[in-house]
């Protein structure tokens, strides 16, 4: 039975999800720079290209069926078992197809030397899809604590093994080991905590009934995947594996704040918005509050990383990657521009706006791929990233219009309120960048530049938020006070 959604359950589950992603953040904050210092850009690029294909096929294989399970009114085990077997059959076919056609696919992506990686990594597809049903059951039950624990365990073991193998000289195999260890541990953990045991029960009719919703979700997820992963494919094909490796390393690090906040919040918001589907007022309030809070948290991290990209790249990745600091900065900037859109995907999914989500995701995918390709074909990696920033700025306006129109919220009002923390973060970053460029020479140590810039930026941003977001802060304070247990009346125990 799906639990009742209220502020307490949402806050608790967001807390567990954030804890899980924070653990992952800490690991990647340490392991990505270590691996980058040991491995070459070409090795990073080869694995990143192969992983893009695997993730794409795994996403198609799921066909959105498990997302449909999440919003079903009742947990019918015949339907659950049917989805499991459908997922497994599709996963095995996908893995076999990737194994057979690895060479032409790798050549198409501009990385023919990565064909053997595609064959090995094809085994990841059934490992990933095999746990989707167990995970969807935890999401339905709003039980994110158990998932959080196993996420941290799987990521920790994978990261530790990757670093150890890299230090022992295993090179690219250390990255493969990280992927397989994390996938196997997470798969085992999901089945252990969900207590789901597949049975030989299958109903094609039930699978087809779910597909009416799932195909719309799958289409939008494919388009979103293309949006996020097409830059890697374009860069690999037109600029080579070295630039693809630089992009991959920078993108891994720049994506850490998103993974901490967005992955955690989005997983909880999807079922939450789903249960508020027919309550327009609560749904609208939840949309605006969650959007403001995620923007307040994410925007300073993204714009701050843009401002301090040069010393950050040198300190974290070492001198062999120092040339790629503009890529890190522009990637952080491109992600910072989209921070007000952080809650839009789970909102549209949760309220059943699958068609709207699909068409907008498709438009965004085409625009992003075209912009990055335009910058890469006749330019450089930096030019491609500049065009990514431009298309994301246009996306911010368009996406906001789509969502606020679906929510019946005035567009300009919604855009202003949701983007206000982002503007404050941008102003903070401009000041920090100005100080670094004009006074950075007086602090020759990159570590000290990073510390000083972070401290100055934190003070500036805090002041700006206190000045511009007082109503939001008061509301959060009132919510925190309301969650405190009230004292029992004097005669309650008599």
UniProtKB/Swiss-Prot annotation:
Compartments it resides in: Cell membrane
Q: Which UniProt keywords apply?
A: Cell membrane, Exopolysaccharide synthesis, Membrane, Plasmid, Transmembrane, Transmembrane helix
Q: Which CDD domains match?
A: MATE_tuaB_like
How does it sit in the bilayer?
Multi-pass membrane protein
Q: Which Pfam families match?
A: Polysacc_synt
> Main localisation, per the record?
membrane
Transmembrane parts of this sequence: 16-36, 44-64, 82-102, 105-125, 157-177, 215-235, 253-273, 297-317, 321-341, 343-363, 384-404, 421-441, 447-467
Q: Which family does this protein fall into?
A: Belongs to the polysaccharide synthase family.
What's the protein here called?
A: Succinoglycan biosynthesis transport protein ExoT
């Amino acid at each position: 039975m799906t639990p009742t959604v209220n502020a307490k359950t949402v806050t608790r589950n967001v807390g567990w999800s954030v804890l899980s992603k924070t653990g992952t953040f800490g690991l990647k904050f340490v392991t990505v720079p270590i691996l980058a210092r040991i491995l070459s850009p070409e090795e990073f690029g080869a694995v990143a290209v192969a992983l893009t294909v695997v993730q794409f096929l795994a996403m198609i294989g799921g066909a959105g069926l498990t997302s449909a399970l999440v919003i079903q009114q009742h947990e019918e085990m015949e339907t659950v078992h049917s989805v499991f077997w459908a997922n497994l059959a599709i996963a095995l076919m996908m893995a076999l197809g990737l194994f057979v056609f690895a060479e032409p696919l790798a050549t198409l992506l501009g990385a023919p030397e990565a064909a053997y990686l595609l064959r090995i990594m094809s085994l990841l597809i059934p490992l990933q899809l095999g746990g989707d049903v167990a995970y969807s059951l935890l999401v339905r039950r709003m039980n994110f604590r158990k998932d959080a624990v196993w996420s941290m365990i799987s990521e920790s073991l994978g990261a530790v093994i990757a670093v150890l193998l890299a230090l022992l000289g295993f090179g690219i195999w250390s990255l493969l080991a990280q992927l397989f260890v994390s996938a196997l541990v997470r798969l085992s953990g999901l089945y252990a905590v969900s207590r789901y045991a597949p049975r030989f029960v299958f109903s094609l009719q039930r699978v087809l009934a779910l597909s009416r919703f799932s195909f719309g979700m799958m289409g939008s997820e494919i388009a979103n995947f293309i949006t996020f992963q097409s830059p890697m494919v374009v860069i690999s094909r037109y600029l080579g594996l070295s630039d693809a490796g630089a992009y991959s390393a920078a993108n891994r690090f720049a994506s850490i704040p998103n993974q901490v906040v967005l992955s955690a919040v989005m997983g909880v918001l999807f079922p939450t918005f789903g249960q508020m589907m027919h309550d327009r007022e609560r749904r609208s309030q939840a949309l605006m509050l969650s959007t403001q809070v995620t923007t307040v948290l994410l925007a300073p991290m993204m714009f701050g990383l843009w401002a301090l990209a040069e010393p950050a790249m040198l300190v974290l990745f070492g001198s062999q990657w120092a040339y790629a600091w503009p890529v890190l900065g522009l990637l952080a900037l491109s992600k910072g521009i989209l921070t007000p859109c952080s809650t839009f995907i789970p909102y549209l999914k949760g309220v059943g706006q699958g068609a709207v989500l699909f068409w907008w995701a498709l438009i965004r995918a085409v625009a992003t791929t075209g912009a990055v390709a335009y910058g890469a074909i006749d330019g450089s990696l930096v030019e491609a990233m500049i065009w990514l920033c431009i298309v994301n700025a246009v996306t911010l306006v368009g996406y906001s219009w789509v969502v606020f129109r679906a929510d019946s919220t005035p567009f300009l009002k919604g855009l202003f309120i949701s983007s206000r923390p982002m503007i404050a973060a941008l102003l903070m970053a401009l000041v920090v960048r100005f100080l670094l460029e004009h006074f950075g020479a007086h602090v020759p140590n990159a570590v000290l530049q990073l510390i000083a810039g972070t401290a100055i930026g934190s003070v500036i941003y805090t002041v700006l938020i206190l000045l511009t977001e007082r109503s939001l802060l008061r509301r959060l304070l009132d919510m925190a006070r309301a969650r405190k247990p009230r004292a029992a009346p004097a005669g309650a125990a008599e």
